Every structure is written in C-alpha cells, then in structure tokens.
C-alpha cells in the first residue's frame, strides 16, 4: 500500500513497502533550493527517521536536473542580509545537511540529471548514490565568487580530499563516469534502468534487520577516518556485544539456524 504526503510545497513524499521517496519538486528552476525547501527537507527527514514503517529513504528529483544548488533569487536576497542574518541562514542549510546525514534510516540519492553546487551536498549526505550515465557534476561555487563551505565536510568525505582540491578550485564539470571513479557515486546506469536499480537496492536493504542497519550506519560514521586506537577498538567490541544480545540480533541468528524468515520479514504489512 502506498501513502502520499502533500504537506509540502517544494517536495513530494510517498511511502510504499517500507520505502519512502522524497522528491525535489521545483523542476521549473532546476530544483534549486531556497529557505522553504531547506526547512521542508529538514522536517521530512526528521519525521521519516523516526517512522517505524520506513526502512530506507530515496531522495529523488522531478524534471531533467537533480539539483542546481541554491536558488539565485534567494541568493540575491541574502546579499542584503546582515552578517548575523547570513550566519543564521547558513546554519539552517548546515543543519538540514546534518539531519539527512545523521538520519537513522539508510538514504539513497537517485540522480536522474545534473548536480551542481549545493546539490552536490545533497548527494554527499546520502549513504548511497546512483546516477544516470548522462548526469554531470560540478562544484561551481567559485565561479560566483563563493565557496562550498557548508557542503564541504560531506563532499570531501564522499570524494576524498585530493579530488576535492581539484574540483573545489577548478569548478570543472565532470561526468558520471568520473564521479564513479572518484567514489562520489556508487553506480552509473542508463536512464531507463535508474528506477529499477534503486528499487532493487531498496528491496535488499528492506530485507535486513532494521536495528542492525541502523547500527551499521552509526558504525560507519564513527570509524570513517578515525585512527585505530584502543578506545576505537573498545567501541567496536561493545558494538558487537550489544548487537549480539539485542532482540533482533538473537532473532536473526535463531531464524538462520531454524531455516525460517526472521520476524522483521513476517510482520503483516
């Protein structure tokens, strides 16, 4: 059963078979974001992150462009803001990116078109990114006399510091093949296969223990780039001990030994 939420002006939201789809819906301006879209993205990912019926969230976009970054009309208005107002406004964008990045549910960016500037941040904060072969990518901020500051922690994690040095400074456009080589996206597919590829991946995630998936996401955030210290090792020891003793940990092992489905797959829809 599919449920749809129409409470947003710049987003479309639906949930079907444990998969939530959040679609950027400003195709007339290439899904550029403004303060309204930022607030709505922050709200919807906060809500979906606590929805027990949702096990994976797809971030998609309407039209030919995934996201062109910030709305130029909004940016023009920001030029007249005071320093304090600019700080507050930038913080809203930063908090939205953090909300998606820290969302307890796995997130997948389904990239059907070009990604520019702040749109790169939306891709980078998702756990998995799949793009069509014709998609182009660009960190274009320096062309406008700006810097990709709020998105930088996530983009650098996604493509690596060395690659970021080149593309932050040059504002070069690169294609999906290069994005895949850099590790910025995980897969590049033909346009007609994007929906099926994303659906297949969602189905695989939905079959897994929701608690274990959440634990893995937290684990990845905690250990990525961290030095291997005694404290880190102790945290990993505690992590496996806790998950083994958890309800779903016990159920998963028992179900495997008994050659049956675990209960998270047998709960009525």
Describe the predicted segments one by one.
Residues 1-62, 98, 195:
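Conserved CoA-thioester-binding segment of acyl-CoA-metabolizing enzymes
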Residues 97-144:
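Glycine-rich beta-to-alpha active-site loop
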Residues 153-162:
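Hydrophobic, secondary-structure "cap" segments at the distal end of domains
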């Amino acid at each position: 059963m599919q449920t749809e939420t129409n409470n947003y002006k710049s987003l479309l939201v639906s949930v079907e078979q444990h998969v939530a789809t959040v679609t950027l819906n400003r195709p007339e301006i290439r899904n550029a974001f403004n303060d309204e879209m930022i607030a709505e993205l922050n709200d919807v990912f906060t809500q979906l992150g606590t929805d027990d019926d949702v096990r994976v969230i797809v971030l998609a976009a309407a039209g030919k462009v995934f996201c062109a970054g910030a709305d130029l009309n909004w940016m023009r208005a920001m030029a007249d803001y005071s320093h304090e107002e600019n700080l507050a406004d930038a913080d809203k964008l930063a908090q939205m990116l953090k909300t998606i990045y820290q969302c307890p549910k796995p997130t997948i960016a389904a990239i059907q078109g070009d990604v520019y500037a702040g749109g790169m941040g939306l891709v980078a904060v998702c756990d998995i990114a799949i793009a069509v072969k014709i998609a182009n990518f660009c960190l274009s901020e320096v062309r406008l006399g700006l810097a990709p500051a709020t998105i930088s922690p996530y983009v650098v994690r996604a493509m690596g510091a060395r690659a970021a040095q080149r593309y932050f400074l040059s504002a070069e456009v690169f294609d999906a093949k290069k994005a895949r080589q850099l590790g910025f996206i995980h897969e590049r597919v033909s346009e007609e296969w994007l929906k099926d590829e994303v659906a297949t991946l969602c189905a695989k995630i939905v079959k897994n223990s929701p608690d274990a998936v959440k634990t893995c996401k937290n684990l990845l955030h905690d250990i990525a780039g961290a030095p291997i210290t005694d404290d880190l090792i102790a945290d990993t020891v505690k992590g496996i001990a806790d998950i083994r003793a958890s309800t779903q940990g016990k159920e998963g092992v028992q179900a495997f030994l008994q050659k049956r489905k675990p209960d998270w797959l047998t709960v009525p829809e």
